[in-house]
Amino acid sequence: MGKELYDGFSEARDLFEQANDYFKRRISDVMFYGTEVELMRTENTQPAVFLYEVIVASIQKTFRPDVVAGHSLGEFAALVLNGTISFEDGLNLVLKRATIAQKVCEKFNTGMGAVIGLSDAYVEKRIKEIGDETGELIYFANYNGPGQVVITGSKKGIRLACKAFQRHYA
């Protein structure tokens, strides 16, 4: 994730290296060579996505929007890109957010999953059914938009729900 940007753009390379220095570890190596398991750990996912978003927008030399916006984690990239906060402040905030989320997931054995391509009503109905059938906790976390929701709950509940939704091509 992002290796072609690192190799192809000096500005991207500089931002990757700034992030590596700030995090005191090579997040770029996790992004370029990490396993799926490593990339799925929120302590890696959130900084990686933030960094990728900032880099992709930063190398767009001819595209300078008047307004930027972001949703959830994307808000931090938007704040950096519109100059509200510095890149380093964005790294700091995202690292704190990711660390807290990782600790909560580990302490409470919880997780989350994005469900894309199914109606909100169907997802809502199925997570209730799966929860009732298994006793596992499964909840809606976000309605991101039509046909895209985030569910949260016990890791087992999320796995069961994701399997059920994959059978319906989500």
What residue spans do the PLM features occupy?
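Helix-rich "cap/lid" substructures immediately adjacent to catalytic or cofactor-binding pockets
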Residues: 1-69, 151
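Gly/Ala-rich beta-loop-alpha elbow adjacent to hydrolase catalytic centers
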Residues: 53, 66-74, 78, 86
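Short, glycine/charge-rich beta-strand/loop segments that flank catalytic centers
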Residues: 36-37, 69-76, 98, 110-114
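Alpha-helix C-terminal capping segments
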Residues: 58-61, 79-85
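Alpha/beta catalytic cores of group-transfer enzymes, especially the acyltransferase/condensing modules
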Residues: 22-25, 82-170
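An amphipathic alpha-helix/helix-turn recognition signal
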Residues: 14, 48, 72-73, 85, ...
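Gly/Ser/Thr-rich helix-start
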Residues: 3, 35, 71, 75, ...
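Glutamate identity and glutamate-enriched acidic tracts
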Residues: 4, 11, 17, 36-38, ...
